[in-house]
Swiss-Prot record:
Listed Pfam families: ATP-synt_A
Annotated signal sequence range: none
Biological role stated in the UniProt entry: Key component of the proton channel; it plays a direct role in the translocation of protons across the membrane.
Complex and partners: F-type ATPases have 2 components, CF(1) - the catalytic core - and CF(0) - the membrane proton channel. CF(1) has five subunits: alpha(3), beta(3), gamma(1), delta(1), epsilon(1). CF(0) has three main subunits: a(1), b(2) and c(9-12). The alpha and beta chains form an alternating ring which encloses part of the gamma chain. CF(1) is attached to CF(0) by a central stalk formed by the gamma and epsilon chains, while a peripheral stalk is formed by the delta and b chains.
Protein's recorded name: ATP synthase subunit a
Biological source species: Anaplasma phagocytophilum (strain HZ)
Transmembrane regions listed in the UniProt entry: 23-43, 62-82, 84-104, 113-133, 143-163, 176-196, 201-221
Record's keyword annotation contains Methyltransferase: no
Keywords, sorted A to Z: ATP synthesis, Cell inner membrane, Cell membrane, CF(0), Hydrogen ion transport, Ion transport, Membrane, Transmembrane, Transmembrane helix, Transport
HAMAP family noted in UniProt: ATP_synth_a_bact
Membrane disposition: Multi-pass membrane protein
Family: Belongs to the ATPase A chain family.
Length: 242
């Protein structure tokens, strides 16, 4: 089996639509729904208090995640950005759940597909743009022309800044998808190699796979962290401005 077979999108339910549209329910959609449910269940479990007053593992985990999100927003967008904690927290939990679920046996990594990560990135960047105009009006356009820019350099600076702004969702999407694809592919290749080895020689590569899986879990958390931090950095343009 090809190492890339794990990323194949499979139709689970055909939904006929006119004009050649295809909105069939796929394994990718199924695991995105599962990731959303896992995030919701984790939050619900964290809100429940134990009778003895002690904190559960889910409560501790969510508290750590919440503190990270608050810290990231305060560091990049300032106190004014704290009203958007639910949005940023939802982004982090969804990306993290998608990444982790993809590592599990029979799992599917929705964030390995650029279509999914690009949709997430467009939502983030579009939201930032709308919030920017909502908070600052037309003054939001100042992000394309830094204060003190010489007049002769202004057209080039506006072009560069506009290009960089429009490239944000693409760079966010490709970074996340590429890292998910790379890690899962390496594990699949080595796992297939181990299966073909003599049983006497298999334990060492098998142990190496376990190390790679642990590293992949770290990468899954790291990529969710990076995606969230960049979201708060972009949010700072809307809330704080330049």
């Amino acid at each position: 089996m090809s190492p890339l077979e794990q990323f194949k999108v499979v139709r689970l339910l055909e939904i006929p639509m006119p004009f050649g549209m295809d909105i069939s329910f796929t394994n990718c959609a199924l695991f995105m729904i599962l990731a959303s449910l896992v995030s919701a269940v984790l939050l619900c479990c964290a809100l429940r208090k134990r009778t003895d007053g002690s904190s559960s593992m889910s409560h501790t985990a969510v508290e750590l995640i919440y503190n990270f999100v608050v810290g990231a927003i305060e560091s990049n967008a300032g106190v004014g950005g704290l009203r958007y904690i639910p949005f940023v927290l939802s982004i982090f939990l969804f990306v993290l759940a998608c990444n982790i679920i993809g590592i599990l046996p029979l799992g599917f990594t929705a964030t390995s597909h650029v279509s999914v990560t690009l949709a997430l990135s467009v939502v983030v960047c579009a939201s930032v743009t709308v919030l920017g105009f909502n908070h600052q009006g037309l003054h939001f356009l100042r992000i394309f022309l830094p204060e003190g820019t010489p007049l002769w350099l202004a057209p080039m600076m506006v072009f560069i800044k506009l290009f960089a702004y429009l490239a944000r969702p693409v760079s966010l999407a490709i970074r996340l998808a590429a890292n998910m694809i790379a890690g899962h592919t390496i594990i699949a290749v080595i796992a297939e190699f181990v299966l073909k080895m003599h049983p006497v020689l298999a334990p060492l590569p098998f142990a190496f796979i376990m190390v790679l899986i642990a590293f992949e879990i770290f990468v899954a958390i790291l990529q969710a962290y990076i995606f969230t931090v960049l979201t708060t950095v972009y949010l700072s343009d809307a809330v704080a401005g330049h």
